């Protein structure tokens, strides 16, 4: 019997790479317009090199970038980049198709929903709130809550403990086989690979199920939960219509 579903955030709920690329590209154009003497291609490579070294959530990436290029921080250029980045970030953060509908369906099945992310706490909450899906989640566990990243079992285990759910009663949904799937399987959870968010061309995910659209998760959970869960969802919808 499934009682809970745990989601990764980036590239599972939100199209993170598309969003990040758009924000960085906007910052690069603004910094060049402010006087930075570099081609967009050169700037992009150096910025993502810094992200590769220090993490994709690194908050001082443009400071480090300017230090590497100029030997100092030109605050006019830095300000132009940060403002453009933030504007683009606000306008391009979107969920994958059907995310809100899938979460609503799961919510109506009376399942507990959780997020487990390697990102910092504030960044995770900002994304959930901006997408308008924060109200669906009983539990949100971030890097700040455990100090370790997936595939270490601690983040997912903490989410299960907070929801008071056993591993065999929960499903883990994620896009990164080596992190999301392996860690959850170690705990004994059912795993679902979000192939629509896969950035690595993964051939064998090792997951129990794979989906190409988040709505495909619904029949999987219904099957694992038995007919009672589907009956609850249908009954809830009928009750709402009668009102």
Model-derived segments and spans:
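N-terminal helical cap/lid subdomain that shapes the substrate entry/recognition surface
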Residues: 2-100
């Amino acid at each position: 019997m499934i009682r809970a579903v745990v989601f990764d955030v980036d590239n599972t709920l939100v199209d993170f790479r598309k969003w990040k690329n758009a924000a960085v590209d906007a910052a690069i154009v603004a910094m060049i317009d402010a006087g930075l003497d570099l081609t967009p291609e050169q700037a992009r490579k150096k910025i993502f090199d810094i992200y590769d070294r220090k993490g994709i959530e690194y908050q001082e990436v443009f400071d480090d970038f300017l230090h590497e290029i100029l030997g100092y921080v030109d605050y006019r250029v830095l300000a132009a980049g940060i403002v453009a980045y933030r504007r683009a970030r606000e306008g391009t953060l979107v969920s994958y198709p059907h995310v809100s509908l899938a979460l609503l369906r799961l919510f109506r099945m009376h399942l507990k929903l959780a997020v487990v992310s390697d990102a910092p706490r504030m960044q995770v909450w900002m994304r959930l709130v901006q997408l308008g899906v924060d109200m669906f989640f009983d539990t949100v566990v971030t890097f700040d809550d455990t100090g370790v990243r997936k595939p270490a079992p601690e983040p997912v285990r903490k989410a299960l403990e907070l929801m008071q759910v056993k591993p065999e009663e929960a499903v883990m949904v994620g896009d990164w086989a080596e992190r999301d799937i392996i860690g959850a399987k170690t705990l004994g959870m059912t795993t679902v690979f979000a192939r629509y968010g896969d950035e690595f061309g993964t051939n064998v995910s090792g997951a129990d199920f794979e989906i190409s659209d988040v709505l495909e998760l619904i029949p999987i959970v219904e099957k694992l939960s038995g007919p009672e869960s589907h009956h609850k969802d249908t009954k809830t919808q009928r009750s709402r219509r009668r009102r």
